[in-house]
Amino acid sequence: MDPNTVSSFQVDCFLWHVRKQVADQELGDAPFLDRLRRDQKSLRGRGSTLGLNIETATRVGKQIVERILKEESDEALKMTMASAPASRYLTDMTIEEMSRDWFMLMPKQKVAGPLCIRMDQAIMDKNIILKANFSVIFDRLETLILLRAFTEEGAIVGEISPLPSLPGHTNEDVKNAIGVLIGGLEWSDNTVRVSKTLQRFAWRSSSENGRPPLTPKQKRKMARTIRSEVRRNKMAD
């Protein structure tokens, strides 16, 4: 096992422990608490994958952090903080919308890289909007916390979430997952659009209605479908 993978996990465990203490003292805001819950699931998944005990890893992580802080001067810390890019946390969903349980009549689940896509195939002929909570850096999506699909009535009918056992994903991973979710929902004659915030940061070349542009493969498939419909209509005439 790569020692850097182990030490990274150990430090992450200790830093999560510190953030948990902050939350216990009621010093964290909603985005802080949201990330804390998500990171807890991620650490459990990583610990299981690596075969490492979280409590033991936390103690070792504390030693690593203490050693670094002891060796680092205040001036070096100031320079690091000044040069580090700042990320922003953007929220389409409320805490209630993010934490609400939902159920599927005809569940479908697909794993796309480090992301899990879930949708209810029983939903038909609905107007659906995709909302997400995520962080942004350099005007691009940095980390997806959670994406959900809502009907006009507020029912949850789809979701994209990071896999706890596979931390880390790219902007391209998110775009691909959104395309899969949209395609699955539209298969049942639903009309899907994307929130303005997600449209702005997840991709730059969306159409005006919040839809990503069709890929060449999708365009060819649509052309074949149209030709097939035309032939059937001619035969019917």
Swiss-Prot record:
A motif (Nuclear localization signal) lies at residues 34-38. It is found in: Host nucleus; Host cytoplasm. Pfam families: Flu_NS1. The keyword Ubl conjugation applies. InterPro entries: NS1, NS1A, NS1A_effect_dom-like_sf, uS15_NS1_RNA-bd_sf. A motif (Nuclear export signal) lies at residues 137-146. Residues 1-73 are annotated as: RNA-binding and homodimerization. Residues 223-230 are annotated as: PABPN1-binding. GO terms for molecular function: protein serine/threonine kinase inhibitor activity; RNA binding. GO terms for biological process: symbiont-mediated suppression of host cytoplasmic pattern recognition receptor signaling pathway via inhibition of RIG-I activity; symbiont-mediated suppression of host gene expression; symbiont-mediated suppression of host mRNA processing; symbiont-mediated suppression of host PKR/eIFalpha signaling; symbiont-mediated suppression of host type I interferon-mediated signaling pathway. Residues 204-237 are annotated as: Disordered. Belongs to the influenza A viruses NS1 family. Homodimer. Interacts with host TRIM25 (via coiled coil); this interaction specifically inhibits TRIM25 multimerization and TRIM25-mediated RIGI CARD ubiquitination. Interacts with human EIF2AK2/PKR, CPSF4, IVNS1ABP and PABPN1. Inhibits post-transcriptional processing of cellular pre-mRNA, by binding and inhibiting two cellular proteins that are required for the 3'-end processing of cellular pre-mRNAs: the 30 kDa cleavage and polyadenylation specificity factor/CPSF4 and the poly(A)-binding protein 2/PABPN1. In turn, unprocessed 3' end pre-mRNAs accumulate in the host nucleus and are no longer exported to the cytoplasm. Cellular protein synthesis is thereby shut off very early after virus infection. The dsRNA-binding region is required for suppression of RNA silencing. This is Non-structural protein 1. The gene is NS.
